[in-house]
């Protein structure tokens, strides 16, 4: 409500939350505007400045990371809570995930060290100066905590008999929203989750550096992988399906 749309910008009025969730939102320019967003005091407004453009809605897949901050900005606006407080109250604590805290880097060097440093991370969620958590990266989870989130998805949003996330949402987020993406190893995309096999309901959260939550609904299997920073990791799913999954399935048999 407190954002002023740039003069002449019309496309932004047609953009929905679903466009952001499915990476089909239109943006001005190519690539993520890391510097302009991350050096601003309000990352949500800075990201909104890049939303829209003259081409209008094309429904083309355009993977962005930093501009997803719009989603957490909307969440904070709607709930009147910080991202991490909302997650702790309604997701993490109910399923036994470690309680997380906000972390904000004061300098560019500190931000870089947080991203690429190999020292163990505390349970934190990277945030902007206003305390709004990043949506596309920066959530530090252990493999155990990642597996708990995967198990929640596997169980259609239920944990120990309690519905934490609606089964309808789990089904919708893991349903392809567009044809297989040639440039992304023929994977499909749902709501911020990669769909690996729509027929067998196999899907995955693939994060920064190749961190993965892999969910195989047919085989009732969840695999979580954590990793140090490495840019453009493309083989993590192959690693899981070629080495980890067969090993686990052999043990189950």
Label for each model-derived stretch:
Residues 1-62:
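Active-site-proximal loop and beta-strand segments within enzyme catalytic domains
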Residues 93, 102-111, 121-174, 178:
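Flexible, glycine-rich surface segments
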Residues 1-25, 78-136:
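Active-site helix/loop module of the DD-peptidase/beta-lactamase fold
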Residues 29-32, 76-88, 157-165, 234:
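Structural helix-adjacent loops and short alpha-helical linkers that scaffold large soluble proteins
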Residues 202-253:
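Structured C-terminal helix/loop/strand segments within mature extracytoplasmic catalytic/sensor domains
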Residues 20, 61-92, 145-153, 220-223:
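Alpha-helical scaffold elements that line and support the substrate/ligand-binding pocket
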Residues 112-133, 172-223:
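Active-site Gly/Thr loop motif
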Residues 50-57, 67-69, 127-135:
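Flexible glycine/proline-enriched surface loops and loop-helix/loop-strand junctions
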């Amino acid at each position: 409500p407190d954002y002023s749309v740039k003069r002449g910008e019309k496309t932004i009025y047609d953009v929905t939350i679903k466009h952001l969730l499915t990476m089909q939102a239109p943006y001005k320019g190519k690539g993520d505007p890391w510097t302009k967003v991350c050096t601003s005091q309000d990352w949500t407004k800075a990201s909104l400045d890049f939303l829209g453009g003259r081409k209008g809605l094309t429904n083309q897949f355009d993977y962005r990371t930093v501009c997803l901050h719009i989603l957490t900005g909307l969440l904070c606006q709607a709930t009147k809570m910080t991202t991490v407080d909302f997650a702790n109250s309604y997701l993490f604590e109910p399923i036994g995930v470690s309680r997380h805290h906000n972390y904000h880097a004061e300098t560019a060097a500190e931000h870089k060290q947080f991203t690429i440093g190999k020292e163990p991370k505390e349970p934190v969620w990277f945030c902007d100066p206003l305390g709004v958590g990043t949506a596309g990266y920066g959530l530090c989870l252990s493999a155990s905590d990642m597996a708990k989130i995967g198990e929640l998805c596997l169980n259609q949003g239920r944990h120990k008999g309690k519905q934490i996330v609606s089964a309808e949402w789990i089904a919708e987020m893991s349903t392809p929203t567009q044809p297989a993406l040639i440039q992304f190893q023929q994977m499909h995309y749902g709501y911020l989750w990669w769909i690996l096999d729509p027929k067998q309901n196999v899907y995955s959260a693939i994060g920064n550096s190749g961190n993965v939550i892999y969910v195989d609904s047919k085989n009732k299997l969840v695999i979580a992988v954590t990793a140090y920073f490495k840019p453009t990791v493309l083989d993590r799913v192959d690693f899981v399906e070629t080495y980890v999954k067969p090993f686990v399935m052999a043990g189950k048999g």
